[in-house]
Amino acid sequence: APDYILCDESVHDDLVLALQKNISQFFVEGVDAAKKDYCSIANEHHFNRLKDALANALSDGATLVCGGETSKEGLHLTPAVLTDVNYNNSIMKEEIFGPILPIIKVQSLDESINYVNENEKPLALYLFSNKPAVHSEVLKKTSSGGMVINDCVLHHMNPNLPFGGINNSGVGSYHGKFGFDAFSHHKAVLKSSSISPFKVMLPPY
């Protein structure tokens, strides 16, 4: 799941409304009624980690605009959407690995690019724009493990594309031949002929 959204202020409110509408439709009868269609958090440790991260962000000034409901039984947490998140809060500095989505309001494309570049390189960058010039600029000025334009996660489903991170988000790639190469050792073997270059490289000259 994406760790955060950098959203232009001109469409911020529309995005929040759209997320509220879609999440409320899925959980119209609450999280317990939706459990058969919605997976739980992997274990209690990560469930508590996510609850603590959410509580910490809220205590640091963030606003919960929808979601964040926990099930009475099991380890279910509805997708929590946050606004007004402090840039320096830990939820913006670590990979969340859970259904919590902070939305950061930005005033320009440059501000978004600068934020991405000032933090750890992401496993994936998802860009939503209908402007080819914006596509090119973000592609040239940012570094990420992968990039998808106007969608999410689809590159992970294509066996012909390498999937992997860069720096802290991962090393190497897998899928198809990329995975075979990543888990293979390319052994260098050189057999020198009788005409060795060292004959002219070593003294006496």
Located regions from the model:
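Short internal beta-strands
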Residues: 5-6
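Conserved C-terminal structural/oligomerization subdomain of aldehyde/semialdehyde dehydrogenase
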Residues: 69, 76-205
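NAD(P)-dependent aldehyde/semialdehyde dehydrogenase
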Residues: 9-121
